A protein has these predicted regions:
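N-terminal beta1-alpha1 ligand-phosphate binding loop
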Residues: 6-45, 177-178, 199
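Glycine-rich phosphate/pyrophosphate-binding loop and the adjoining helix
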Residues: 13, 33, 143-213
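Short, solvent-exposed amphipathic alpha-helices that sit
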Residues: 27-38, 134-149
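N-terminal beta-loop-helix "entrance" segment that forms/cooperates
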Residues: 42-66
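Helix-loop-strand module that forms the ligand-binding subsite of alpha/beta enzymes
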Residues: 59-143
Length: 213
């Protein structure tokens, strides 16, 4: 498993999952990943390097996540969602009885932050453009995943039009990202955010292992 931490000796409080299936073709996500590695207290996990065979070490991942106050999901938006390995990580690591449901309180009180890029410009996420919806329409799966696990879903940091962005635009965005990581949890807007809604899953809805709906 690949484990990378930023310089410094303070305890890890941020767990960042960097998920990109083709890093060699990445510019924006690669810059963001490398910037995160320079911030103290950030545990960076390059999912596609850690699990090229998609065999996720659930116990190890749960231990890393349990130590963190903030979970960061860093990835490109692909087909209006997350890369396949990031989705598999959620499916396997956020298990019933640990992350949610009866006895599943390991993540209560933590924060979840989406840091994502899109290939198309922001104006393409509009009812009159080819993506047909404002980008917020694609956020509910992220928001509800966090809520079901008792986490606050923080305002996402998005970089639209990553393919056509200038070097200056990318540098400015990476600086904002680095500053936010380094200053967490001292973000002014967090003081006004409401706590996570209660999402109680009754025992009758408990998923059974190896059983499909």
């Amino acid at each position: 498993m690949t484990t990378t931490t930023g310089p410094g000796s303070r305890p890890t409080s941020i767990y960042l999952l960097a998920a990109h299936p083709h890093w060699r073709d990445s510019r924006a996500n690669l810059a963001l990943r490398e910037a995160a590695r320079q911030v103290g207290g950030v545990d960076v996990n390059d999912l596609y390097a850690s699990y090229p065979d998609y065999a996720i070490d659930v116990e190890a991942e749960q231990a890393r996540l349990a130590r963190a106050d903030l979970l960061v999901l860093l990835h490109p938006i692909q087909w209006y969602s997350m890369p396949a390995l990031q989705k598999l990580w959620l499916d396997e690591v956020l298990s019933y009885g640990w992350a949610y449901g009866g006895g599943g309180s390991a993540l209560e009180g933590k924060d979840c932050w989406l840091v994502a890029t899109t290939g198309g410009p922001e104006k393409s996420y509009h009812p009159q453009s080819y993506n047909r919806y404002f980008f917020d329409a694609f956020l509910p799966p992220y928001e509800q995943t966090a809520a079901l696990c008792g986490m606050r879903f923080l305002p996402p940091l998005l970089f639209h039009g990553a393919r056509s962005a200038t070097d200056e635009e990318l540098v400015a965005h990476v600086e904002v990202f680095s500053d936010r990581l380094a200053s967490y949890p001292n973000w002014p807007e967090l003081e006004d955010m409401e706590g996570c809604p209660s999402c109680v899953v009754p025992a009758t809805d408990r998923p059974h292992e190896h059983e499909e709906a």
